[in-house]
Amino acid sequence: MWDLGRELAHRGHTVTIIGGVGQRREPAPGVRVLMFPFINRYRFQALPLLRRAYAEAKLLERLSMAIAALPELISGGYDIIHIQKPYDLGPALLARRFGGARVVLGCHGEDFYPGDTLLAPHVDAAVSCSRFNARTVAARYGFEPTVVFNGIDTSLFRPVAPNPDIVRPADGAPLLLWVGRLQPWKGVDVAIRAIQDIPQTHLMIVGDGETRADLERLAQGLGLAERVHFLGALPRKRLPSIYAAADLLLATSFASETFGIGLVEAQACGLPVVASRFGGFPEVIDEGRTGLLVPPRDPAALAAAVRALLDDPARRRAMAAAAPGWAAQFSWSAVADRVEAAYRAACNGKI
């Protein structure tokens, strides 16, 4: 919302971002930020009845903030209240009832909970981050959201010089890249196993998370410790030069991926992608032109696709040249155009 808020403020809209007390970025000119206290979801999950009830605990966390924020939502004179998850439906609809604001529901995942189906039909407009996500939302709520892709900062993510700290293999071997949180459904093990079938190729893994130790043991056990390099989590501002140092980006998720922001950022930097044909990934790749798609959880298919591109440098260069132009549709300016259209639909009562 920070980047979208900046773009909307630049267009002359009066923008307020409301969130919980915590770390904050410096807001853009014209963007007001209000922070309210909340009760962390983990405190709710400490209660025996909520120990395994993530959605309900998250709902209570958001409601605890909404109690403090509700007077502002009602009396703030807002034309549009754009919520980012269904958890905020109740407070937003109260503000609609008593303050007159129109409510736009943003959906980026499957953040559903008991009772949300009673509230969602009362919003004025809804947006989803991909067609994949829109189908999920439509199946639950009975209406089709407008697809508004997530955005990227194209002033940051663009072709740049390679990071000088990334040392290419001395033998000139290809360098593959994986970027993201190390979690079970991200399928990083698939990328590591695929390396077995791509001789001399090296894999850089940027990110950290709960599966890192297991992945390091896997690489060691497969005899790939010298070819799989764990760089840990890096600041986003360093990623463009990391993308520039690689030959291909691998994206191997098999669950919980409604978009694929890292794939878009890589393409904006001129890096072709080989990704799972899953979730929102097929929507953010121009298949055959900026990257390839393979079946999820299939190391052999991933290795074959990577080899096909590594063995065809001309095709890979053509993909690299086409990728930034394709990624331009995900700029915050383009996203703001679609969001403004959704806001106009909300004001006209067209969901």
Model-assigned labels for residue ranges:
Residues 61-62, 83-88, 107:
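Short His-centered aromatic/hydrophobic patch
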Residues 98, 216-234:
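Nucleotide-activated donor-binding/catalytic signature segment of Leloir-type glycosyltransferases, i.e.
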Residues 174, 178-197, 210-216, 292, ...:
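A conserved mid-protein helix/loop that constitutes part of the nucleotide-sugar donor-binding site
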Residues 272-275, 285:
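Short hydrophobic beta-strand element within catalytic cores of glycosyltransferases
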Residues 287-288, 292-299, 308-313:
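Conserved acidic donor-binding segment of nucleotide-sugar-dependent glycosyltransferases
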